[in-house]
Amino acid sequence: WDSFIRGTPAWLTALQGEPHLTVERRDLIEPLPQPMPDFQWIIHAAGIASPPFYRKYPLKTIDANINGLRNLLEYSVAQAEQGKPVEGFLFYSSSEIYGDPSPDMIPTPEHYRGLVSCTGPRACYDESKRFGETLCVVFAQQHGVPTKIARPFNNYGPGLKITDKRVISDFAREVIAGRDIVMFSDGKPTRTFCYSADAITGYYKVLVKGHVGEPYNVGIETPEISMAELAEKITRIAGELFGYTGKLVRQPNPEEVYLVDNPNRRCPDISKGRAHLGYDPSISVDEGLRRGTTPESLASLK
């Protein structure tokens, strides 16, 4: 289910007709249709996760993370009452629930409570994800819903929308067009980047093996690189793969709140996932970028 508020990705259109996949245009913030099918597993990944888009649609962002989630949790309670309980319920939260951690909390463990603005331009996303986690914990405690919580850290790979307005999508768009990579910051903020194959493995492990009502970081611990270093890596790899000749240029961003409350560093501690789930991501950022910067992979972003 998806409202497709930002359009339908090409990779999903290509999967139409697959016998084990049904795609429906629905908005989870609306009442669920009746009767509902009997689902064994629920993955709630619906949401607006790109800063420019959740600033454009702040109320829809809040509604998806709270009201849409509540609808699915209530459905799970009703299923249990009918003797058809769901086996697992995965909520995609976010590493943004940590806000801008202090240096002593990098890498950031799940027990860190966060340093988050509740009124800034990112608050509609950050705070609704935090409250979504609270809903998951309460429904697990009060109703026995087998909720598990994943906190993604900068996942990337083939299939990202080129209009996503996040850093790798922005850089890839310029590479595809043969233009210089434009950076709207000083390039100093750092992130770790987890390739989609490793991330998806992590999500399924959280869903199947995670402890009920508990959060798990899904990302990779190293290397923690700056945005400038990321741009340099993409420029070099694209040059090696298909002769890209662009360079990195810096420009001021016309959007005044572009960097307001933007975390300076983002790096997960995944020791809990290793211990509970056997989660051990292994694809380096260089290897992931090389996989994601082939002409075929770049074409999947369009």
Question: What is the predicted role of each segment?
Answer:
Residues 131, 135, 139, 171, ...:
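Hydrophobic alpha-helix immediately C-terminal to the catalytic Tyr-X-X-X-Lys motif of short-chain
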Residues 7, 56, 64-67, 123-126, ...:
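Residue-level signal for the nucleotide or nucleotide-sugar donor/cofactor binding architecture
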